[in-house]
């Protein structure tokens, strides 16, 4: 049973329905009970009555220690946030007239970024009259993509944006 967000839960006296489908401490079904009987069962067991599915017909309420539940819920959320990995986009800037050695250095940097799980935006800035030779820039980007095809896929093909041509690569492991 999926439990909704903690701020949407009604507890004990906050519950305003006539009858509830009651779930016990161990998750067993106790049947449909009037609210007063469910509340007295909760008081007798020294636990809280928590409305966990208010939109169901009849609404579902569970006997539980709300303080403990809230603590476990927050702990679980914290663990999930820890496990989340943030994918950043790193940029490698090239020139349409880049030399082989410089290209190899930029390629090595791009490969490092991809191996760490980051996406790589490869951009070429055209200066002055270079803009008339867009095919040279496209060839440089194609060479970069070909050199990284074993560890990356092209997420966004080469495209012009003003005086800049760029493409985006993503590590293969992210897309499996």
Swiss-Prot record:
Protein's cellular compartments: Cytoplasm
Q: Which GO terms describe its cellular component?
A: cytosol; membrane
Q: Which UniProt keywords apply?
A: Cytoplasm, Initiation factor, Protein biosynthesis
Record's InterPro entries? T_IF-3_C_sf, T_IF-3_N_sf, Translation_initiation_fac3_CS, Translation_initiation_fac_3, Translation_initiation_fac_3_C, Translation_initiation_fac_3_N
Name its GO BP terms in alphabetical order. ribosome disassembly
Pfam families cross-referenced by the UniProt entry: IF3_C (PF00707), IF3_N (PF05198)
In alphabetical order, the GO MF annotations are: ribosome binding; translation initiation factor activity
UniProt family annotation: Belongs to the IF-3 family.
Report the function annotation for this chain.
Answer: IF-3 binds to the 30S ribosomal subunit and shifts the equilibrium between 70S ribosomes and their 50S and 30S subunits in favor of the free subunits, thus enhancing the availability of 30S subunits on which protein synthesis initiation begins.
Assembly and partners are described as:
Monomer.
Q: Which NCBIfam families match?
A: infC
Q: What is this protein called?
A: Translation initiation factor IF-3
